[in-house]
């Protein structure tokens, strides 16, 4: 039996990348998994909060972030090893970028990474994350660390069929549309994107930018304030869709000429994969973690946070029809991972 941890994801009202990973894996694991939560110092069945009886062949599987402070007694649970332990590791962004990360996340992360070393098996969401985690353990000097393999996350984010024909986007306004998805915060770097688009609009380049995402209440308001200021100046060329449903997001994909992903740091970069699933080329930051998927085609990597390079790249994707058609053809024809395949990888690794 796989006991699948939904302590946070089962009650969360927003749809972050971590929530997406948990929900899609849970769907694909189906009857092989039972949902559990950490409740009052013990792991319990999520449906009725009853106690669990483990056998040595059972697995506890979590894709969540945790600490002893958030889950009193969890460290003792790991030490007692009532069953086998497996985890999915995302990234060390709170340690690498503490100035733009929730203080609670920054405080939690060192202990979280250390607790991961007590598991029997860990999957990292990218090769970059795998090397990152192993490097942290090496620096920390932990002994008996578990094997870490790469789990390729799915591109089929909402279970929809993949677009496999290079159709042209249906932009109702007649102007090409760029789509930027992700939480509004400094790490996602919408500020640089807004300034780049502002300059292109001032140079009379006709296009729309659609920004979709919830606002990080700690870091997002200044970005939203700048966005609204530019909206007053440029009107309908800049549109903000906060908290859009999956259906609204699908509409935006259908109208998009390209997605733009100027992020400063990622564990995997699901927006890139999800864009390709929709057959939409992605202009993305030239991060090693994103290159793991971008190099397969359909993407235009651009130097991280380089205003001049992004301006050139956006102008090219908006005006060079032959280049855009090439990227679209690559996007719809290249192989892409699915959540069903990710679940199969886990089942094989767990021997279930």
Each language-model region and where it sits:
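Carbohydrate transferase catalytic cores enriched for Leloir-type hexosyltransferases
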Residues: 1-352
């Amino acid at each position: 039996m796989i006991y699948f941890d939904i302590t946070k994801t089962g009650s969360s009202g927003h749809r972050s990348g971590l929530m997406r990973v948990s929900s899609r894996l849970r769907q694909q694991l189906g009857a092989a998994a039972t949902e559990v939560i950490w409740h009052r110092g013990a792991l319990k069945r999520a449906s009725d909060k009853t106690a669990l009886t483990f056998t040595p062949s059972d697995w506890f599987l979590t894709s969540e972030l945790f600490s002893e402070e958030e889950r009193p007694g969890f460290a003792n649970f790991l030490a007692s090893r009532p069953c086998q332990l497996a985890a999915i590791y995302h990234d060390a962004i709170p340690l690498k970028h503490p100035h733009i990360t929730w203080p609670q996340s920054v405080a939690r992360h060192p202990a979280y990474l250390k607790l991961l070393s007590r598991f029997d098996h860990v999957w990292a969401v990218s090769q970059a994350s795998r090397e990152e985690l192993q490097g942290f353990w090496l620096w920390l000097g932990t002994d008996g660390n578990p094997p870490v393999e790469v789990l390729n996350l799915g591109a089929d984010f909402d279970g929809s069929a993949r677009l496999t024909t290079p159709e042209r986007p249906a932009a109702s306004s007649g102007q090409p549309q760029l789509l930027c998805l992700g939480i509004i915060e400094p790490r996602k770097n919408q500020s640089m994107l807004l300034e780049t688009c502002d300059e292109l609009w001032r140079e009379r380049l006709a296009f729309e930018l659609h920004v979709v995402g919830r606002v990080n209440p700690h870091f997002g308001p200044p970005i939203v304030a700048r966005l609204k200021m530019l909206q007053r100046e440029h009107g309908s060329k800049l549109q903000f869709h906060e908290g859009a449903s999956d259906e609204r997001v699908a509409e935006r994909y259908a109208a998009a000429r390209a997605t733009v992903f100027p992020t400063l740091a990622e564990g995997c970069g699901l927006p890139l994969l999800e864009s390709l699933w929709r057959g939409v080329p992605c202009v993305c930051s030239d991060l090693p973690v994103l290159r793991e998927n971008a190099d397969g085609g359909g993407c235009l990597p651009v130097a991280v946070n380089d205003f001049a390079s992004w301006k050139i790249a956006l102008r090219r994707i908006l005006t060079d029809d032959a280049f855009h058609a090439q990227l679209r053809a690559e996007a719809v024809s290249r192989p892409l991972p699915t959540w069903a395949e990710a679940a199969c990888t886990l089942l094989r690794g767990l021997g279930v």
